[in-house]
């Protein structure tokens, strides 16, 4: 397999600009013929014109005359082109129904959709397919009117008509220049839900959501989420929508969550369709977040885009930050923040410590699809949040305004964003640039001592070596701190001339001591408040210190983190006891703290549910070597069993309290969702303590399962039960919702994530289910993806879990390398496993690597893991 690596250092501005792009799609069966007419302007006359493409090439013309060209692989080179502005006409033929990669133009059912980010446009036609080539697009679509009554593309519809042969045509014009990755086309038989939004300047924007006719009743929440996002972006950022129409199309076959194509967003149905019968509270929250995210891209991604794909976090990190803020402003800011932190630590921290570690702005890649990562998105969002922490809301907004003033309509870099933040606030952020160029999660080691009424906090920072870089420079790290006395009260202190109960300490050196003055009593420091930087922070807290922070700290993150640390210590003690073959510890202090949390009626319910959540196995073994996953699983399960049995009466009582507070008729709202979240926590502990309770659940299932959140909670709680009753409940669930694709995704996820002893057998059976298709990414992620995260089965001692996933990677890679590359990253833990499992994984990876025709998507990941 040939290996082509692209490097950030090799960036050159494009030799040619494409001022105007006129596209003509003639959709027939089975082929679609695409004609493009490009108005090209040389930037460096004399260089050849190089176009990217993989479609069947029919013809190439320059200024109307047939052109001489060389086609090698996916590169079309025209050596002899005019030195002044000229036109290029390219005609290609594509077969959408045969395109199983879901990139470019592809069929989903009887309809056609596109996905062009990052390099899908080249599957449609030949083009300078890079984000810094921005062009004004006009698109004409011709198709059979009966089969494809709806024809959509970017921008505003400016013309249309019918032919005598039963075909019709529509012409779309996008007045804003955009790169090719933002092009979109949809053709099919779709129903539309319409609404309107009046912008802050009084413009009346038409909103259209396209779905199947059957799904039309499920789009209401997504429509309202869009209107809320449009209003929020005006209020918080002063950003107004710029076209006459905003369209969203939902498709069931989609590699990603959604795509922000200018004026024509294409969404995975998972993030559009919802009602109480089929969607959980988490689904509703996900829809609001993703709808917001894609809308916010209109400014942070579309109006200002990336110069090159190495700068992907410029748009994605910033827009994730914006959608997190949107969700936080909508409901439960503290809980949303902790959920984001947990996502980061469960998924991005291991990525930063593994074989695929890369900076927020990568320096090289073989396959760009592999860099749509947690690092680029979630760590990128934390980098943006640090700007906000350092500058405050006012300073951050000043930076945003300058960013748009300088760069609206341009393709720019992460450094341009940093410069806008620095210049708008008169601050030097040169050192901050290391967050973009250094991979790895910084580790802070902190110590504190009280001396002469000064609490001296000493912090040392190290950035661990990663495959791309051994030696790292000290980072600029904001550490937000507070102090509590032994009664749990906030203690004021003086720092840099200000007296307060909280301050942001700015680390810029490998080791610094920060004097917090005017402290006259013993204190416990509350460190990294709000998770002010994406780092590990270690401080020699005693258990009593952590119990005090858990009971009294006003900062939600440090309170939750105290609980997480106590749980981690308890699991570590269980792990040691299991290894030594002795009895498990009693954990009396932890249990007393948990009892207080359960009994605290003043706690927010969603926050209480978070405090009662034990870290996952992946969080528990993070930062360790020679990992035996089953030992961690056993130690964690033992702690959960202890909590379940010890507080069984309290779980029953708390469940009854929550049931009383819920509305009888389900309607999603953050307040009622919090109660349902707590109920599901209680149910899980009850069914863990009393597995036989499953029979009562089965008898009263229809009464208990009033909405999908309840059904999800109940089935999750019984999913590991070895009885036939569990199988019957799951089968009933599948029968009940057999015609709902998204709920069937939930069913397949239950099968793949079960801890039952026969799970692998049940997964293999589910592969033959009439509603399962490996070619559908949602289905593959639900069944195969969930199994790859199933600790006891994926990491089975005999290697059967590894073999199963490897076989599926090979199978999926033949038609959808992007999904296969995501799945193969389940093996990223390879080199940290104990020797037996490490060898098993390496055997499977070598088998994958030996496959003829292996994609560069999968090959790049496998190569990095094997080293």
Regions found by a protein language model. Give the residues of each.
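N-terminal, polar/Ser/Thr-rich
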Residues: 1-33, 58, 102, 106-115, ...
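Surface-exposed beta-strand/loop patches in extracellular or lumenal glycoproteins
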Residues: 37-56, 127-129, 135-144, 415, ...
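A surface-exposed beta-strand-loop module
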Residues: 43-45, 52-108, 129, 164-165, ...
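Beta-strand-rich binding/interaction modules
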Residues: 47, 57-63, 428-431, 439-527, ...
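Extended, low-hydrophobicity, Ser/Thr/Pro/Gly-biased non-transmembrane segments
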Residues: 91-194, 219-221, 432, 556-558
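Short acidic/polar inter-strand loop motif in beta-rich domains
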Residues: 93-101, 464-465, 531-537
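Hydrophobic alpha-helical and helix-loop surface patches within well-folded domains
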Residues: 172, 201-459
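Long, ordered, helix-rich scaffold segments
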Residues: 373-374, 517-867
